[in-house]
C-alpha cells in the first residue's frame, strides 16, 4: 500500500479521468472546523505517491472533482461557500482561475457531469443545489427542496439530465435538471444520509449511506423499499463509490475507520475485503477507472492511501 502524508485532514480523493496515475485530494486544517484548506494534485508512482501541485485556500476544502472536458482543471468546494477551479499547469501556490461564490454556507459536494462534460453540480449546507458551467459567471440553475444540509449531489453517469441528492433530512431525491421540482422523494433512512452514488451500469439504481451504519440500494422506479441493505460498518457510512468495472461491486468508507469492498451478488457474504489502514475517520474514497481494482482513500489521520485489490473476478 502506498501512502502520502497530507499534513492537513483529508476530505476527498478523485482519480483523473484522463491520466491513470493522477489523483486529486482536498484537505482541511483542524478537521475542517476552522483554518485553511489545501488542494493536492498527486501522482501515484511505482513505489510511492508524490505531490505534483498544491494550492492553498483560506478556508477548509470538503470535496473535489475533475473536469470532464479539460484534463488540467479540477474543482474544489469550500467551507466558505465557494467553488474554485484550479489549473494544474499553473505553479503550486497559484490562485484559482475561477471562483464561484453564490452558496451561503459550506459546500460539501461537487460533481462533474460525465455525459455533457460542460457542467458541474454542487450541494451545500444552505439547503440548495446549483448547476454551473465553468465558463459562466453565475450558476445556471438552483434547486431548493431539502429541509436540512445537503451532503451529496451526484450526476447520473448515463443520463445527461438526471441527478440524485441526499440530505440530513433523511431523504434521497431524484431530479431532472430541466424541471424545477424533484421527480421523486424517497425517505431512504431513519437518520441523516451522508452519501450517495449511481450504479455505473444501471441508471435506475442509486446507493445511499447513512448515519444509521447501513448502505441501501434503490431502484428509483420502485421507491417503497430498498432492493438490498448492506450491513457491516459500526459507525456512520461517510462515502460510497460504485465500481467502474463491475455492476455488482461498490466500496464504502466510514467513521469506524474502515474501507469495505462489497459484491452484492454474493448475497450470503457480500463483504469481499475490509481494510483498516487508517487510524481516524475515513471520508474520501475512489476507484481508478483505468486500473481495475485500484483504489484510493483519505482520512482525518492525514494519510492518502492507494492500493490494488486485483481484478474483481478473483474474489468470486
Curated annotation (Swiss-Prot):
Belongs to the WD repeat peroxin-7 family. Pfam families: WD40. Coiled coil: none annotated. One of its GO terms (cellular component) is peroxisomal matrix. CDD domains: WD40. GO terms for biological process: peroxisome organization; protein import into peroxisome matrix. WD repeats lie at residues 56-96, 102-142, 145-185, 188-228, 232-272, 277-316. GO terms for molecular function: peroxisome matrix targeting signal-2 binding. It comes from the Eukaryota. Keywords: Cytoplasm, Peroxisome, Protein transport, Repeat, Transport, WD repeat. SUPFAM superfamilies: WD40 repeat-like. Interacts with PEX5; interaction only takes place when PEX7 is associated with cargo proteins. It is found in: Cytoplasm, Cytosol; Peroxisome matrix. InterPro entries: G-protein_beta_WD-40_rep (IPR020472), PEX7 (IPR044536), WD40/YVTN_repeat-like_dom_sf (IPR015943), WD40_repeat_CS (IPR019775), WD40_repeat_dom_sf (IPR036322), WD40_rpt (IPR001680). The keyword RNA-binding does not apply. Receptor required for the peroxisomal import of proteins containing a C-terminal PTS2-type peroxisomal targeting signal. Specifically binds to cargo proteins containing a PTS2 peroxisomal targeting signal in the cytosol. Cargo protein-binding triggers interaction with PEX5 and formation of a ternary complex composed of PEX5 and PEX7 along with PTS2-containing cargo proteins, which is tranlocated into peroxisomes by passing through the PEX13-PEX14 docking complex. PROSITE patterns: WD_REPEATS_1, WD_REPEATS_2, WD_REPEATS_REGION. The gene is pex7. It comes from Dictyostelium discoideum (Social amoeba). This is Peroxisomal targeting signal 2 receptor.
Amino acid at each position: 500500500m502506498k501512502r502520502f502524508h497530507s499534513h492537513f485532514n483529508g476530505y476527498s480523493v478523485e482519480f483523473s479521468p484522463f491520466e491513470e496515475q493522477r489523483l486529486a485530494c482536498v484537505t482541511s486544517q483542524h478537521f475542517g472546523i476552522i483554518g485553511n484548506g489545501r488542494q493536492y494534485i498527486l501522482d501515484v508512482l511505482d513505489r510511492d505517491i508524490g505531490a505534483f501541485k498544491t494550492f492553498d485556500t483560506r478556508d477548509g476544502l470538503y470535496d473535489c472533482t475533475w473536469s470532464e472536458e479539460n484534463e488540467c482543471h479540477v474543482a474544489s468546494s469550500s467551507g466558505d461557500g465557494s467553488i474554485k477551479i484550479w489549473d494544474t499547469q499553473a505553479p503550486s501556490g497559484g490562485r484559482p482561475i475561477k471562483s464561484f461564490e453564490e452558496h451561503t454556507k459550506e459546500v460539501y459536494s461537487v460533481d462533474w457531469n460525465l455525459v455533457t462534460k460542460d457542467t458541474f453540480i454542487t450541494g451545500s449546507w444552505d439547503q440548495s443545489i446549483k448547476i454551473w458551467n465553468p465558463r459562466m459567471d453565475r450558476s445556471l440553475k438552483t434547486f431548493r427542496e431539502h429541509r436540512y444540509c445537503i451532503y451529496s449531489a451526484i450526476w447520473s453517469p448515463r443520463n445527461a439530465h438526471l441527478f440524485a441528492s441526499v440530505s440530513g433530512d433523511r431523504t434521497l431525491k431524484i431530479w431532472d435538471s430541466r424541471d424545477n421540482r424533484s421527480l421523486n422523494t424517497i425517505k431512504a433512512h431513519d437518520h441523516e444520509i451522508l452519501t450517495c452514488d449511481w450504479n455505473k451500469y444501471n441508471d435506475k439504481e442509486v446507493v445511499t449511506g447513512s448515519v444509521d451504519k447501513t448502505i441501501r440500494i434503490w431502484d428509483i422506479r420502485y421507491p417503497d423499499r430498498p432492493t438490498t441493505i448492506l450491513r457491516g460498518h459500526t459507525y456512520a457510512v461517510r462515502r460510497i463509490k460504485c465500481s467502474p468495472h463491475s455492476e455488482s461491486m461498490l466500496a464504502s468508507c466510514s467513521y469506524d475507520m474502515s474501507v469495505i469492498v462489497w459484491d452484492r451478488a454474493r448475497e450470503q457474504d457480500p463483504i469481499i475485503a475490509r481494510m483498516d489502514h487508517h487510524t481516524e475517520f475515513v471520508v474520501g474514497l475512489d476507484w481508478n477507472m483505468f486500473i481495475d481494482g485500484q483504489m484510493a482513500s483519505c482520512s482525518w489521520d492525514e494519510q492518502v492511501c492507494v492500493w490494488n485489490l486485483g481484478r474483481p473476478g478473483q474474489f468470486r
